[in-house]
Amino acid sequence: MKHKLISAKVIADSISPEGVRMTTMEIEYPRFILAELNTHRMLSKNSASSRAIPVKAMHDFIRANPATPVHWGKNQPGMKAKEELTGPESKNAVFIWNQAKEDALHWADALAHKLAVHKQIANRITEPWMTMKTVISGTEWTNFFHLRNHPDAQPEIKALAEAMTVAYTTHLPVQLKPGEWHLPYITTATYVPTGELQYFDENFNRLDVEDAKIISASCCAQVSYRKNDPTFEKAFRLWEQLIENDPVHASPIEHQATPMDISSMCRFEPETWQPGVTHVSANSDLWSGNLRGWIQHRKLIQNEAVW
């Protein structure tokens, strides 16, 4: 079932010569299910941030797009509400939910504009009514779909998983070779005479692969404040702030990846592994961070994590 504030679209979809699919989606959903989404650690995520979006902008967005439950379940023992409120009870529940939203907006505004409290605090009051935008990438989707597209899941995350399942199963991935990059928010095309994969910005200006990776990372990072400026200038400013700074904030570079050159490596001889390969699993698959069969951009960056 479709819901107004819950959506999913594929923005990059690739498959390696070994048949491992790497998919990136842009999803929208109520913030109150973010914790459930974040339990799926095999998927990389960047999301809109209460710390990054100004209070007034956040309040304007909440008033235009308030998050609401998709199923007003009656109270009962356990985690699943099977019976739904109807008639006056349902209308009253919606009224109380919306009144609580107005109260929260009032007090958050008082903190921010009367006491000059920072947005990272003031925005917390209104989080139940926020909708989230997230960029999510990975090679391991089966368990997410199995758990969340299920009758026992909370209705809102079930609706999200349904939308994501449809997006995933109806989209065809593009075949990539080692050295060719999966890059969200970057347009790609194969130059037929040479077979070379080429990269382009939103104005179809050609990019070299390193610039394309930086712009892709910038666009993934900008989800934090619900904007998308794909220009060189913005990309390189953000790259300096996030990647060339200390500490490195590397989550936006988890969405870019290239297929592993499996034929060049011996799985149980780490000295033969490509840069970026991090481990081998018990079933002999090679991994780069949370990506199977793909080299994750993050794992090619010095000091991407402190151990």
Protein language model features and the residues they cover:
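A conserved ligand/cofactor-binding region detector
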Residues: 1-307
